[in-house]
From Swiss-Prot:
GO process annotations (BP): isopentenyl diphosphate biosynthetic process, methylerythritol 4-phosphate pathway involved in terpenoid biosynthetic process
Gene3D superfamilies xref list: 1.10.1740.10, NAD(P)-binding Rossmann-like Domain
Residues reported to bind NADPH: T10, G11, S12, I13, R37, N112, E114, G189
Underlying gene: dxr
One GO molecular-function entry: NADPH binding
Record: residues binding 1-deoxy-D-xylulose 5-phosphate: K113, S135, E136, S160, H183, S196, N201, K202, E205
EC number of the protein: 1.1.1.267
Stored NCBIfam families: Dxr
Pathway assigned in UniProt: Isoprenoid biosynthesis; isopentenyl diphosphate biosynthesis via DXP pathway; isopentenyl diphosphate from 1-deoxy-D-xylulose 5-phosphate: step 1/6
Organism this protein belongs to: Persephonella marina (strain DSM 14350 / EX-H1)
Protein name per the record: 1-deoxy-D-xylulose 5-phosphate reductoisomerase
Job of this protein: Catalyzes the NADPH-dependent rearrangement and reduction of 1-deoxy-D-xylulose-5-phosphate (DXP) to 2-C-methyl-D-erythritol 4-phosphate (MEP).
Family from the record: Belongs to the DXR family.
Amino acid sequence: MKRLAVLGSTGSIGTQTLDIVRKYRDRLEVSLLAASRVSEKLLDQIDEFKPEYVYIAEGEKIKGVKTLIGEDGLYKLAQLDIDLFINGISGINGILPTYLLLENNKKLATANKEAIICLGEIYGDKYSDIFPIDSEHSAIFQCLLSGRKEEVEKIILTASGGPFLNLPKEEFRYITPDQALNHPRWKMGKKVSIDSATLMNKGFEIIEAHYLFNIPYSKIDVVIHPESIVHGLVQFIDGSVISHLSPPDMRIPICYAISYPERWEIDVRRLNLAQVKNLTFLEPDYDRFPLLNIAKECGEKGGACPTVLTTADEIAVNLFLEGKITFDMIPVYIQQVLDQADFSKPETFEDIIFIIKETEKIFWNILKLQNVN
């Protein structure tokens, strides 16, 4: 019986993880559920899966279950004897639990890009033990099994292009949050859906791939693939290319992260290539989606830059979702913050937290000067 901790259990990754648990109750046991707060959904999960522990970021103890609360609770969470921690927390909130789990040498499967990116400068040497849940990085992981690292010529990440792949740039300012959240292929949370619409998500994945697989940026490419069938490719020095194909369903990489090195049957739509008919691959349009290049440049620069990028993006996305800035201004504000930020390379976790807080101050000062409330 494999014991799981599901961090972000009420979110998109968490609920799909629990779908896998439902199918394999004879193999999987939920030891801990973690969420930001008590909700009806969390209480329903507790009732169904009966974990020994529950973590909430804030609130009161939950009757009938060992409850861990706040930052002190996170430190206790990271010391629990659990076989696999699944981090489905969205955004910068996923950084501290990731740091603590790495510090305690816990087995971790994660979908939290921000933590991988921000902690990469100081914890990259521990990333070889992390199992990626992202469909693209799960695909690359599997493709890399076909050869040795020194035989890899390049890796290729695919991007759907999001809901605005063919929308003229001059219309970006009129995009609404509801339109941006309506991804044509994937069912995701709000933050990652907006990042997919701006292609920042793919920019993050470039940096993530660099850290997870210890691959230089010069060997990481991106192509637009609207069908979202091919999730990643690896080209080897003999000219061969190994690719990973599957229907666009996050339960596939989640289940693989749980079952590895085995593969377990799951109830997802099977791929029928005759019905797919066409697989399209396009060069990214860096003019319409500048965050892709901005992210890669931040990764290449290293130091504090990736942390500044993730912090600025999180604020910009939230402002857009709140209707305070337009869609086309997301990359503009992020670039303005990057231009003003000047921090030393982080050496400790405390340095990363300092960079995050100072970046937030820079962003809010920019907004204040431009009378954005």
